[in-house]
Amino acid sequence: MKLKDFPKTDQNIITAMKSHIGIDRAIKLNTLAQQLKLTERALQGRIEALQGMGCAIGSIDNGYFIPTTEEERRLGIIKKMRTGSSISRAVDGYNLAELDWLEQLEGIK
C-alpha cells in the first residue's frame, strides 16, 4: 500500500507520526490534534482505524508513538488492552443499570 492510497487526513497523521518514532518520542493527543487541526475524538477514531489497517501506532499515557522494538509494541498493546477492559466494564455496568437508577438514589433532588 502507498501513502497516497490513504485518505488525506490519514496521510497527514502518518506523516506527522514519522517524527514520533520510538516510545521516548511519544506525542500527546491534544498536541497532535492541534497540529493536524482535528478534534481529539476525530484523531482517536482515525488512529484506531489506522491500527485496524495494520499501522503500528502505539499509545501509552505519554501519547502516541511508532514502536521500534517488540518491547515498545508490547507496552502499547498492554495499554490498549487495559483501555478495552475498562470500556468493557463500563458497558457491562451501563447494560445492567436500572433505567430509574437516578430516582432510586437517596438524597438527590
What is each PLM-predicted segment?
Residues 51-61:
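A short, conserved structural fragment
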Residues 1-16:
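Short alpha-helical segments that sit at the start of domains
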Residues 60-69:
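Minor-groove-contacting beta-hairpin "wing" of winged helix-turn-helix DNA-binding domains
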Residues 18-24, 53-55:
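Short helix-capping/hinge SLiMs at alpha-helix to coil transitions
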Residues 76-109:
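Long, low-complexity, charge-rich intrinsically disordered regions
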Residues 38-49:
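Short amphipathic alpha-helical interaction segments
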Residues 10, 71-74, 98:
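Short amphipathic alpha-helical segments that mediate assembly, nucleic-acid/protein binding
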Residues 28-35:
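A short acidic, leucine-rich amphipathic alpha-helix
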